[in-house]
Amino acid sequence: MRDSQNTAQTLTESLKYFLKYRDQTVVIKYGGNAMIDEKVKESILKDILLLKTVGIKVVLVHGGGPAIGELLEKYEQKSQFVQGLRVTDKKTAQLALTALAGKVNKSLVQDIIRLGGNAIGVSGIDGKLIEAKPISEDLDYVGEITAIHPEIIERINQTDAVPVIASAGIGLDGEIYNVNADTAASRIAGALSAEQFILLSDVRGLYGNFPDEESFIDEINLTNLEKLVKEKKITDRMIPKIEAIKYAMFEGLGQAVLLDGRVPHALLLELFTDKGQGTMINH
């Protein structure tokens, strides 16, 4: 009886959050180890289906996880890096698209349908969703995002399906470009003026002195975040994610959250409880 009462109390407390996010857009960037562990993946997808069921416009943007590396290895395509970015020739760009849009994207759509929901998978090249140009001559087909055309997402959001977006870009010349998935997701969130952008990663969130748990930051604004970056208290691994979030917030994004995707039902705990789960970044 007590467990039932606790469940009822939790649902009652969550009501204000159901109302807050109903008919609002929440963009979720999915990647990292959360894509590898099947139990974690199923937990995340179940959470996404619940969000959709209570009237939230969920947009799922994903990277390639290990799938791109595995396909490149299969075709004996060696990777070279310049300043941390993969040099991408035309063949590598095509293989990356195959892994992203062919394997990972359709697998996620299949899993969502298997769990009782509906999903439509597209890549960034469909409808020129993610428009890009070469970031530099040295990196060949590595793309810099120049524009987001979200109309295809908005049309899907008018249905019962979750839009599942593979983060590839296309140029006005029709060439395919490899784009950073975190940047793509944040730019999509900004273009949609999303209420919330959730970036799933492999850490709990931001720390003032990583990995000291006592220094965990549960909420921070852009001004104080800039101070932490200048003081070099944010790990190098997090800097690209922070830069992507900042850009999206200037574009129209409401809030962003860095969240550990490995925690069971982290999405529900973040969106529907007072305490939250990760680090919230606001204006």
From Swiss-Prot:
The record marks K29, K241 as: Transition state stabilizer. Pathway: Amino-acid biosynthesis; L-arginine biosynthesis; N(2)-acetyl-L-ornithine from L-glutamate: step 2/4. It is an enzyme of class 2 (transferase). It comes from the Bacteria. One of its GO terms (biological process) is arginine biosynthetic process via ornithine. Substrate binds at G64, G65, R86, N178. Gene3D superfamilies: Acetylglutamate kinase-like. Keywords: Amino-acid biosynthesis, Arginine biosynthesis, ATP-binding, Cytoplasm, Kinase, Nucleotide-binding, Transferase. Its EC number is 2.7.2.8. Pfam families: AA_kinase. It catalyses: N-acetyl-L-glutamate + ATP = N-acetyl-L-glutamyl 5-phosphate + ADP. GO terms for cellular component: cytoplasm. One of its GO terms (molecular function) is acetylglutamate kinase activity. It is found in: Cytoplasm. Belongs to the acetylglutamate kinase family. ArgB subfamily. Catalyzes the ATP-dependent phosphorylation of N-acetyl-L-glutamate. HAMAP family: ArgB (MF_00082). This is Acetylglutamate kinase. It comes from Lactococcus lactis subsp. lactis (strain IL1403).
